[in-house]
Amino acid sequence: MRIFIACLLIASFGLPAGQTSQTLRDRYGEPDIERFTAPRDIGLTVEYGSDGQACQIVIERKQPLLHSEKVSNYMSPEAVSEIIDELVPPATRGHSINSMIESMGCAEGRTVEYENVWIARHSDMCVPLKRERESTATVVFKRQLCPVSPYAQMHK
């Protein structure tokens, strides 16, 4: 019995330690991208600037990082609006500067440019409209320490 316990202890020391969030932070520093889970199984992927403030946020149905099966990827417009309003309250966006709608078949993309942020939403607009029809939404902050946004490049 003593030999068995000794072997078990020796074997357990040889196993690699789990990679926790804190272990990875200690080894590599603060992440520049993180993912959070909002209500209704919606994922928020956030890219940070060098100052640690959010620069870009992608809102989409949460999926495993490595996935072989397509998960239902649509969200209700109400849920997406609620999350966007939490992340960027209307009073902080600044005045609306420009808006654009792209439509191809059933796919529709709407981008609104404000003084401080761009907000883009992509939906399946096939009739009859489904309750869950938004595939992604993107919030891009216009800050000096953020990478140049693809939206900024489109509006030069």
Regions found by a protein language model. Name each.
Residues L66-K156:
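Non-cytosolic coordination micro-motifs
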Residues R2, L9-P90, P150, M154-K156:
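Short helix/turn-capping signatures at newly exposed starts of structured segments
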Residues M1-R2, A11, S99, T138:
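N-terminal targeting/docking segments
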